[in-house]
Design a protein with these regions (language model features):
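Bacterial N-terminal signal peptides that target proteins for export
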Residues: 1-10
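A composition-driven surface/loop motif
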Residues: 6-7, 24-641
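C-terminal motif of bacterial Sec signal peptides marking the signal peptidase cleavage site
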Residues: 18-22
Length: 641
């Protein structure tokens, strides 16, 4: 949240003078102990979780946030047991080797500084010079079986027709260029023979390159790269990308891919990158490098994909702009339909997922960590983000966990356009805004937890509409907010909302159809429970406050379908809460005892306020409520707009 100088400092001084001053599991969900083999609980959590509040004082956060504050991401090559349905009709069927037949076979065996071939097929010529192997083919239905080891060779394929490339325990190192270079625009069915280990390594320079041929990666193809098989492939790229296609790339269940790239992107596709399944691990260390990148679509349907990037940002003189690393970079669309995606970026300006157009999550598990700071070059800068789209973002299902701790600009989930959340379990814990949209934000379902340790929990730079789901937004102290939509329309028509921060945006009375209570107070401590009960004392829910609000007060916004207009509700602090269902400190169906009363509110209006610790009142923008401040205008203590 950006503020004009002078306004909030003055308000903070007035309010300070007048005041007396995570996540475990829901009933059917277990967010943090999913057994994916990718959470090692590193020792950095102490540094990451001791971020300073806006006032400069240290803040601590309670254990109710579970693994959100300390989960780690690391390379995991453990195989997965996955089922697969092979399509037999439509355009997709052509990409599956099971729907093709390659009966003519050519064997190529590398041995040290030499290579040999066997199997004669009309239309296929194999030329060998030492361990440099060049295949030229006009034949159809050919399978090339490749095995053996060389530390000074390569395989190049020219083919007029689609073919099978069977990697059957091969290790190729080419000090002068690509290890495998496919100069064919036809489909290449790349089979990792079951149980085999295959390794490709390039050199630090590509002196084998010619002016009329591309050589863009350690494993490069002009055509489609369609992977299958239950073997492994390790690619070590020292000059350019690891795996690259000038068409599209497809990975399937059973594939076990590892790419380490030190000078470029790990895996790059021009048209699209499809992950149907398998285990994909990539590491990049070059400046502004990408783990998985496509000029078009990136679509993940299954498997487990892990991306680690460590490079810093860089200035691009051609674009006259700066960019950082990204675990996933889609120049058009990113879609997640299933499987697991883990991204960790530690360099300046690094991002987890970056999408230039539409970003959609339908299902699956996404975990993102960024720890780098903002990258600057002169007056240009790029900030770390967990998930970022320049176009619209739709979060419809699955589980998303994002932690960004690198300082200013480290936002969790950001859309430069509209954001729509309709399902799933979404948790963001970030230094800057946890969830942010430049245009309208709509939340109609799902479980959402958003915590900005030095800024807002949820920040819409346009309208904000909540009609369903559980939405918890935690901002830091003055002038930051739990819910922030500047002075735009804020509609509450359903769902459970809990917002806490130094201040809050006010729901708009004319479009709000579910009662909202706003309370201002002087002090509340990390780990204390705020409880809400009806006038008979029956608990509606409890909320475990995730940080201290002790210096400049706090503002609490609450709304629930169980809180209806005309009825009274008891707000208490410091109760003992046991049992029940817990989502990031929001607890239902629990046993609640003790605590001291904060306020009893009768929800006589759509917006009811209480300044229970003597905060100032407002000027009539919203109706006053029980216990309202002087003037009865409905501005709760702690400061808000």
């Amino acid at each position: 949240m950006k503020r004009l100088f002078g306004f909030y400092p003055m308000m903070a001084m007035i309010i300070a003078a007048m005041l007396t001053s995570g996540c475990s599991s829901d009933s059917d969900l277990d967010f943090f102990n999913q057994g994916n083999g990718n959470e090692t609980g590193n020792g950095n959590s102490g540094n990451e979780n001791s971020g300073n509040g806006s006032s400069g004082s240290a803040a601590t956060y309670n254990s109710s946030l579970g693994d959100l504050t300390d989960f780690d991401i690391s390379i995991d090559k453990t195989a997965l047991s996955e089922s697969e349905t092979i399509p037999t009709e439509g355009d997709e069927a052509e990409d599956f080797i099971e729907n093709n037949s390659f009966k003519s076979e050519v064997d190529i065996a590398f041995k040290g500084s030499s290579a040999s071939t066997s199997g004669s097929v009309d239309g296929v010529t194999v030329t060998i010079n030492g361990a440099d192997v060049v295949v030229k083919s006009s034949a159809k239905k050919v399978c090339y079986n490749v095995s053996g080891t060389t530390t000074n060779g390569f395989l190049k394929i020219y083919s007029d027709n689609k073919f099978e490339l069977n990697l059957n325990g091969v290790s190729i190192t080419n000090p002068d260029g690509a290890a495998i270079n496919i100069q064919s625009k036809k489909r290449g069915y790349i089979v990792l023979a079951d149980g085999t280990e295959n390794t490709l390594t390039d050199g630090t320079r590509y002196s084998d390159a010619t002016d009329d041929e591309d050589m863009k990666a350690c494993f490069f193809s002009e055509g489609k790269m369609l992977f299958s098989g239950k073997g492994s492939l390790s690619v070590y790229a020292n000059c350019k990308a690891g795996i690259r296609s000038d068409d599209y790339v497809l990975f399937r269940p059973g594939n076990n891919i590892y790419v380490k790239a030190t000078a470029g992107n790990a895996i790059k596709a021009n048209d699209a990158l499809y992950i149907k399944g398998g285990v994909i691990n990539v590491e990049t260390s070059a400046a502004a490098s990408k783990g998985l990148s496509s000029d078009g679509l990136v679509q993940i349907d299954g498997g487990r994909t892990t991306v680690l990037t460590t490079g810093t940002g860089e200035y691009d003189s051609d674009e006259q702009d700066v960019s950082g690393c990204a675990g996933i970079k889609a120049d058009s669309i990113f879609v997640m339909n299933g499987g697991a995606l883990f991204c960790k970026s530690t360099g300046a300006g690094g991002k987890g997922i970056s999408c230039d157009q539409l970003l959609t999550v339908n299902d699956g598990t996404i975990k993102v960590i960024t720890t780098g700071k903002q990258f600057t070059y002169g007056r240009l800068d790029t900030s770390p983000k967990g998930m970022k789209s320049d176009g619209a973002m739709y979060l419809k299902g699955g589980t998303i966990m994002v932690r960004c701790t690198g300082g200013e600009g480290s936002e969790g989930i950001e859309s430069k356009s509209t954001m729509n959340i309709s399902g799933g379990n979404i948790m963001a814990y970030c230094y800057d805004d946890a969830i942010n949209s430049s245009k309208a934000m709509t939340i109609s379902g799902g479980n959402v937890f958003a915590m900005g340790t030095n800024n807002d929990g949820i920040d819409s730079n346009s309208t904000l509409t909540v009609s369903g789901g559980v939405v918890i937004a935690c901002g830091t102290t003055q002038p930051e907010e739990g819910f922030d939509c500047d002075q735009n329309t804020f509609a509450v028509t359903g769902g459970t909302l809990i917002g806490i921060g130094g201040t809050t945006s006010t729901p708009t009375t004319s479009v709000t159809t579910q009662p909202v209570a706003i309370l201002g107070g002087s002090s509340i401590q990390n780990g204390q429970y705020i409880t809400v009960a009806d006038d008979s004392g029956s608990s509606i829910f409890a909320f475990k406050v995730p940080r201290d609000y002790t210096q400049q007060g706090y503002t609490l916004l609450v709304s629930s379908p169980k809180m209806t207009k005309g009825n009274s509700y008891i707000f208490s602090l410091g109760a003992t809460v046991s049992g029940g269902n817990d989502f990031c400190g929001y607890v239902t169906d629990a046993t609640v005892s003790g605590g001291s009363s904060l306020a009893t509110l009768t929800l006589s209006q759509m917006i009811t306020t209480s300044n229970f610790s003597g905060g100032i009142g407002g000027g009539g923008m919203q109706p006053g409520g029980n216990g309202g401040g002087p003037g009865g205008g409905g501005q709760p203590g702690g400061g808000w707009h």
